[in-house]
């Protein structure tokens, strides 16, 4: 029997959500209606929901050694996700997204600190043997891992492990 139902690889960070009726104007301060800080990163959110459903999940990712990194690890662990494979990087700050959320849409601004430091050595191919499914998220934010993903998926399929890929947004829009 496999240790995990799904192993997640990708972006994880806190989201700071600011709710307002309009976007701020440069040079002025806009008071928002409400705000909250929550688990973010498309892969992190997916893993958190999966864990909250009672499934066995693990996460491979990187966070900074700071308050936001600690918050993120504690939050996803509270969802029942195994965080032992999340690397704490003492040389960078945790990635973060600020969402200016209006009643009908949102505008996002992100800092890509720890995400871009996720490296192939952080994601050993041995994870294949411990899981039934591998989900990779935010493909375009993981530049250093792109070449490895093909081999990860190939070996997973050879061993009967299913896979999924959420490409996410390409900040360069080169798709």
Region spans (language model):
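Glycine-rich phosphate/adenosyl-contacting loop at the front of the ribokinase-like
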Residues: 1-62, 67-78
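Ribokinase/PfkB-type carbohydrate-kinase core domain
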Residues: 1-12, 74-88, 102-175
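Short, compositionally biased "basic patch" segments
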Residues: 14-17, 21, 91-99, 122-126
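Catalytic-core segment of enzymes that process non-peptidic bonds
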Residues: 62, 95-100, 109
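Beta-strand->loop->alpha-helix junctions that form or flank phosphate-binding loops
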Residues: 34, 61-65, 84-93, 168
């Amino acid at each position: 029997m496999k240790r995990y139902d799904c192993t997640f690889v990708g972006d994880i960070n806190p989201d700071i959500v600011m709710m307002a009726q309009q976007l701020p104007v440069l040079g002025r301060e806009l008071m928002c209606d409400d705000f909250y800080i929550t688990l973010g990163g498309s892969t992190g959110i997916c893993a958190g929901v999966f864990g909250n459903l009672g499934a066995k999940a693990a996460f491979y990712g990187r966070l900074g050694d700071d308050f936001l990194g600690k918050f993120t690890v504690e939050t996803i662990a509270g969802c029942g996700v195994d965080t032992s494979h999340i690397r704490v990087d003492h040389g960078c700050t945790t990635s973060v997204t600020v969402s200016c959320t209006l009643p009908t849409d949102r505008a996002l601004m992100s800092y890509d600190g720890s995400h871009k430091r996720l490296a192939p050595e952080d994601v050993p191919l041995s994870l294949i043997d411990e899981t039934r499914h591998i989900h990779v998220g935010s493909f375009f934010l993981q530049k250093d891992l792109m070449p490895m993903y093909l081999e990860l998926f190939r070996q997973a399929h050879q061993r009967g492990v299913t896979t999924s890929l959420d490409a996410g947004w390409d900040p360069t829009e080169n798709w």
